[in-house]
């Protein structure tokens, strides 16, 4: 029997609930129950149950475990193990700046191990992102959400081509966007973006750029810069995952080996990555442009900037500190930020990283500078 206790989330296909699986003679097991919403079509039901069938084939500590499937009348539910800390992106945003680099690398190693397992079985995920990775009470990360997964042929160079459906642009390899050709190599690209999400504590990849600007910038050679305090070795691995030629990207077996080596040699994580080069044209157009103004009409405010990096909660701190223009903000250092009463290390890093990016943008942008 399954006893549903509360709703913990919802999506396009239905609700996700927390409950307990009651097995005679055994202790109740906490589970997550994904229920297909009422009024579903037969196609939706088939896709829903296909996801369960895929999950049922997997047995790995870094892949979400299927506990069972319920199909009774019009009822359709997928029952999986319950992950106390929810999705990785939300978990990291809640605990911004609270983990060591080694802990973050440990999380990534788990995700990489799960993806290596899937790749070895001939599966491509196609929707790998921090939102589709779940975290348990011991910080073990498990790959979930197999709604878009597909099996590849035995040929290691095989690719899966699809004619329709939505594509998560910010996490998807260029060839998969352009030609809808998915492979284990396109999953590796997505893993690189997950690495960036983890080191940036759940920040949105490419920030407020439009999907079209993301596509254009990546095509022009732009790659996400290292998050504040990111070790050079980790950013280099991200860049390897983002190689334009999919044949040049590392396989998941190599990715996991690199992460394991870093865990066993913590000194290799001490050197931090340098500030990125000038942004690509599409990135410069889409970013919070210091010359054009944050809201497009030339009125550039400290509040607009803080809102753009999701740090709007510190508007009053900056105002009380006398920082009335971005020109003043650009001269701030770590001590200045701490002096405002911003105590969370992750928030300090995010603010300082954004200031660093703005300085870089000003130095790269051509033409006369406007008064700040």
Swiss-Prot record:
It catalyses: L-tyrosyl-[protein] + ATP = O-phospho-L-tyrosyl-[protein] + ADP + H(+). It is an enzyme of class 2 (transferase). It holds the Pfam family SAM_1. It comes from the Eukaryota. ATP binds at residues 8-16, 34. It is a single-pass type I membrane protein. Phosphorylated. Phosphorylation is stimulated upon binding of its ligands including EFNA2, EFNA3 and EFNA5. Autophosphorylation on Tyr-206 modulates tyrosine kinase activity. Ubiquitinated. Ubiquitination by CBL regulates the receptor stability and activity through proteasomal degradation. ANKS1A prevents ubiquitination and degradation. Residues 2-263 form the Protein kinase domain. GO terms for cellular component: early endosome membrane; neuron projection; plasma membrane; receptor complex. The active site is at residue 127. Residues 297-372 form the SAM domain. The modification Phosphotyrosine is found at residue 206. Coiled coil: none annotated. It is found in: Cell membrane; Cell projection; Early endosome membrane. A motif (PDZ-binding) lies at residues 370-372. SUPFAM superfamilies: Protein kinase-like (PK-like) (SSF56112), SAM/Pointed domain (SSF47769). Heterotetramer upon binding of the ligand. The heterotetramer is composed of an ephrin dimer and a receptor dimer. Oligomerization is probably required to induce biological responses. May also form heterodimers with other ephrin receptors. Interacts with FYN; possible downstream effector of EPHA8 in regulation of cell adhesion. Interacts with PIK3CG; regulates integrin-mediated cell adhesion to substrate. Interacts with TIAM1; regulates clathrin-mediated endocytosis of EPHA8. Interacts with ANKS1A and ANKS1B; EPHA8 kinase activity-independent but stimulated by EPHA8 ubiquitination. This is Ephrin type-A receptor 8. It comes from Rattus norvegicus.
